[in-house]
Every structure is written in C-alpha cells, then in structure tokens.
Curated annotation (Swiss-Prot):
This is Cytochrome b. The chain crosses the membrane at residues 34-54, 78-99, 114-134, 179-199, 227-247, 289-309, 321-341, 348-368. PROSITE patterns: CYTB_CTER, CYTB_NTER. InterPro entries: Cyt_b/b6_C, Cyt_b/b6_C_sf, Cyt_b/b6_N, Cytb/b6-like_sf, Cytochrome_b, Cytochrome_b_C_euk/bac, Cytochrome_b_N_euk/bac, Di-haem_cyt_TM. Heme b b562 binds at residues 84, 183. It is a multi-pass membrane protein. It comes from Vireo flavifrons (Yellow-throated vireo). Binds 2 heme b groups non-covalently. PANTHER family: CYTOCHROME B. Keywords: Electron transport, Heme, Iron, Membrane, Metal-binding, Mitochondrion, Mitochondrion inner membrane, Respiratory chain, Transmembrane, Transmembrane helix, Transport, Ubiquinone.
C-alpha cells in the first residue's frame, strides 16, 4: 500500500498534526477562534508592512514625506498603509479577546502556553509602540519621547539607559533608524514565539468551555474547525477592509497629520487606544517610578494567574461569583481606557485612581477569594 504523504513527509507531517488530524474538543465555541485570527493578523501585518518598508525612508527629514508619498503616488499605497495601521487595532482587539477567553475558561492552567502567550503580548506591544513612531508625526515624536523617558525612572542607570536607547540626548534620527530596525525584526520574533506557543498547546491539547478533560470526545480539526476558522477570517478581514476603506482615521490621532516638531508639544499626549488602559494606570500614581512599576505590573500580573487560581473547577462556566468579578474587570478596563484618553484633571484623576486600584484588587485579591468561597458553597 502506498504511504500517505501527508502523514509521512517530514514537513507535511508537522502541518498535518497541527492543522488537519489534530484531535480537538468537540465543544469549543467561537471564543476559540481568536488564536487563528491572530495568526491571520500577523500574516496581514507582515505582508502589508513589507510592502510599506519598500517605500519608507527611516530618516527624520524624509520619514513623514515618504509616508505621504506612499499614500499619494504609490499604486494602492493608501490602502496598504490604512490596512497596516488599522490591522494593528484588529490585532489588539483579537489578542485582548483571546486573553479574556483564557481568563474566563481557565486556559492559564496550561502554564507554559500561557507564559509564552504573555511574552507574545509584551512583544506585540513593543512592536506596536516602535511602529507608531515611524510616520514621524507630532504624536509619534512626543509619544516616543514620553514613553522612552519612563525608563529614566529606573534608579542609578535610568538616564544612561534612556540616552543609550535614544542614541543621543533626545529622540532624533538615530532613534528613528533603530526603531525602524526593531519594527522590522520583532514581527518575525512574534512568528517564532507563536510556533513555541502552539508547540506547548499541542502538548496538552485545547481547553474547552466546560473546563473538563475532553480526551473521550475529540474530533479532527479538519474539516470541522478549518471551516469554522475560515468564517472567522472572512468576518474579520471584511471588518478590517471596511474600516480601512470607509473610516481609516477613526482610531488614529489627528495630531499625527502634523510633522514632528520638537519645539511644539501637543495639548494632550496620548498613545493609541489599545494602550490607554495601561497609560491610565501609569498616570494614576503621582510618582514617576511608582507609575512605571504599576504600568509594568498591569501586564506582568498575567504571569501570576496560574498561581492565583484557588477554585477546584477550571472554568468560570459554573462559578457565578467569579463571572460577576470577571465582567466587572472588563467594565473596569473600559473605564481605564476612557480615562487614559482624558486630560489630567478632576474628576478624571480620581476615577483613574479608583479604577487602577480596583483592577489590581479584583485580580490579586477578589478572584482568589471568590474561588475559595465557591468551593465552600459547592462543598468541593
């Protein structure tokens, strides 16, 4: 009998075991679609980014004009740029929903997969930050100045570190050049980490909405979940193209239509929408080092999730107290996102401080307490 090439060829075998014959729980919902959507986001960003890089010039005197030239004179350059800029927003929407799914259904108990995932989030945030600087508009320049300056809060080595990162005494040409190099490199680091993420995931298999082992009821990934994923791709890409064509600047900052000017500070310096929650936490502490530590903690706290799990059930499906806390946390993050976009004045300051405090309280204190309480109520 002839060998099945799909199952025996050294390379095709890897594809087969990951995308075709992969045993998958039969009951995973649409919340499990976001992993593959993130893969599509990454591919889209790398392709559009590569096309943009062929026309971009990483020099302070030319960067802004090279982006304008791209949008005016390059065939479909405007579309490629709009897809790339808005693709970043979709990337973050998908990753936040993906993390939310992981928190709700207890996926973080696959510790290796979860930890690599958090590292992926940090890498994505770094990539988006350095990418935002490249068009060299006002918000690009001042965003880079403000955020890189935060490292000067590190005791003793801070200022040296910042000047080393800048390549001078302010954000200037060397900074732009190295940020372009980093922005080109990091997506490939993300692609590599994604393979590690999947390798760890396929060691244990996917979790499912019930949070119970599903070994007794697995189905092949293809055709069941390939067709389900394709529906997700179609919906996401349609939304992305619609946004890029009809309202490409909806999520951007108008300040970035003005070329970078070190002598004029914009009235409100703020990052893109997907960083606003962390920016609000940073600003809620009236101390530079404290703010930086809170900013770091707001993301790094995800590493603690497996350690804070006190419930004897994996998923929140049958845990109403934890569910209430989860949705309060979601609402809290939306409040933080709104506060991050507002000026530093009352009542926004106090709202931001309360929202920041409740963010950490819910994750570090209330979730573990709710888990213990539910165990007692259910006599587990």
């Amino acid at each position: 009998m002839a060998l099945n090439l799909r199952k025996n060829h050294p390379l095709l075998k890897i594809v087969n075991d990951s995308l075709i014959d992969l045993p998958t729980p039969s009951n995973i919902s649409t919340w499990w679609n976001f992993g593959s959507l993130l893969g599509i986001c990454l591919v889209t960003q790398i392709v559009t980014g590569l096309l943009l890089a062929t026309h971009y010039t990483a020099d302070t005197s030319l960067a802004f004009n090279s982006v304008a030239h791209m949008c005016r004179n390059v065939q479909f350059g405007w579309l490629i740029r709009n897809l790339h800029a808005n693709g970043a927003s979709f990337f973050f929407i998908c990753i936040y929903l993906h993390i939310g799914r992981g928190l709700y259904y207890g996926s973080y108990l696959n510790k290796e997969t979860w930890n690599v995932g958090v590292i992926l989030l940090l890498t994505l945030m770094a990539t988006a930050f350095v990418g935002y600087v490249l068009p060299w508009g006002q918000m690009s320049f001042w965003g880079a100045t403000v955020i890189t300056n935060l490292f000067s809060a590190i005791p003793y080595i801070g200022q040296t570190l910042v000047e080393w990162a800048w390549g001078g005494f302010s954000v200037d040409n060397p900074t732009l050049t190295r940020f372009f190099a980093l922005h080109f490199l990091l997506p490939f680091v993300i692609a590599g980490l994604t393979l590690v993420h999947l390798t760890f995931l396929h060691e244990t298999g996917s979790n499912n909405p019930l949070g119970i082992p599903s070994d007794c009821d697995k189905i092949p990934f293809h055709p069941y979940y390939t067709i389900k994923d394709i529906l997700g791709f179609a919906l996401m890409l349609t939304s992305l193209v619609a946004l890029a064509l009809f309202s490409p600047n909806l999520l951007g900052d108008p300040e970035n239509f003005t070329p970078a000017n070190p002598l004029a500070t914009p009235p409100h310096i703020k990052p893109e929408w997907y960083f606003l929650f962390a920016y609000a936490i940073l600003r809620s502490i009236p101390n530079k080092l404290g703010g930086v530590l809170a900013l770091a903690a707001s993301i790094l706290v995800l590493f603690l999730m497996p350690l804070l799990h006190t419930s004897k059930q994996r998923s929140m499906t049958f845990r109403p107290l934890s569910q209430i806390l989860f949705w309060v946390l979601v609402a809290n993050l939306l409040v933080l996102t709104w506060i991050g976009s507002q000026p530093v004045e009352q009542p926004f300051i106090i709202i931001g401080q309360l929202a920041s405090l409740s963010y950490f309280t819910i994750i570090l204190v209330l979730f573990p307490i709710a888990g213990v309480l539910e165990n007692k109520l259910l006599k587990l």
